[in-house]
Structures are given as structure tokens and as C-alpha cells.
Amino acid sequence: SSLEGMQHKYKETVLFFPSNGQTCHAYCTFCFRWPQFVGMDELKFAAKQTKELTTYVEEHSDVTDILITGGDPLVMQTRKLANYIEPILESTRNNINTIRIGTKALGYWPYRFTTDEDAQDLLNLFRKIVSSGRHLSIMAHFNHPAELETDAVKQAIEAIRATGAQIRTQSPLM
């Protein structure tokens, strides 16, 4: 790809790594992105410019899906995450149908969606994405069913679903 902090591996999908999301809630032993977290600068890649993603997807009309990943993009404050997403929503091009956000926050810090200082701002951003006619998937990373059992996680799931976003889970087979 020609944009720092992005991989255009698949015809319709761009993986985007915002620089403020290059840390995580946990250090999972199976993570294949570990060089990004341990100070190996030559192996890191992250985007610092917020408008470049929009420019790139406008120039590549075959891109219909953006996966915002990291690290974990939900370690960022909502206003920083919105700086990447809102220009896409405001674009005159309508090629982006799906925005996915990969996160471990639902299992490790469900308060991100309920009681954090900017939790309501995050949920409002989710509503804004959905009301723009785009599909929003929160790609929740879980390692064990027990991570779904706490009241805090249940409340977070309810809050996310109320925005119109879908929650999809992914987990490594170990």
C-alpha cells in the first residue's frame, strides 16, 4: 500500500492502524502484531494523518470495507477515533459500506462503552456511522466464554447493540 499505517491486502478491504491505537488492553501470547507494542520501531507501522485514509479510499473505488485495528483503536479517546472516521462519513464518494473496529475493550474494559468519560461520545459515533447507512461491526476479541458473563460486559453489549452496531467475535483456536 502507499499509505503509512495501512495495508490494502484484499481488493475490497483496507486495514488501518491509527497511531494512537498502537497499544492494547492486554498482551495476548498469540498476537502476531506484538512488534508494534514492544518498542521495535523498525517493525511498527501506524498512520498519523487523519485525512489520508479518506483520500486513499476515495481514490480506490474497489475498497468497500475498512477495518480499523491496532493494537486496539478503542484505547484512543473518542474524538481521536472520530478524526479518522468522520471524514469517511462526510466523503462525497459512497464506496465504503462497512466499517469494522477490532477491539479487546469489550472483554478487558467494558466500561469504555458505559461509564468512561467519553463513553456516550463513542456510542454516538457508532450511531452516526449506522445512521449514515453504513454497516458497523465491533470485532470483539474474546478468549473464553467467561469473559462474556460479567454484568459490566452485558451492559456494554446492550449499549453497543442499541446503537445499531453489530458485535462479532473472533478468537484464536489454541
Enumerate the predicted regions with their spans.
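Phosphate-binding glycine-rich loops and their immediate beta-loop-alpha structural context
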Residues: C28-C31, D72, L81
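Active-site-proximal beta-alpha loop/turn segments in soluble metabolic enzymes
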Residues: P35-F37, D65-L74, K104-G107
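Conserved alpha-helical substructure of the radical SAM core
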Residues: W34-I66, K80-Y84
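Conserved AdoMet/S-adenosylmethionine-binding subsite of the radical SAM
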Residues: K51-E58, L74-M174
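Local cysteine-cluster metal-coordination motifs and their immediate loop/turn environment
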Residues: F17-P35
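N-terminal [4Fe-4S]-dependent radical SAM core
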Residues: S1-F16
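A short secondary-structure junction signal
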Residues: A26-F30, G39-L43, D151-A152
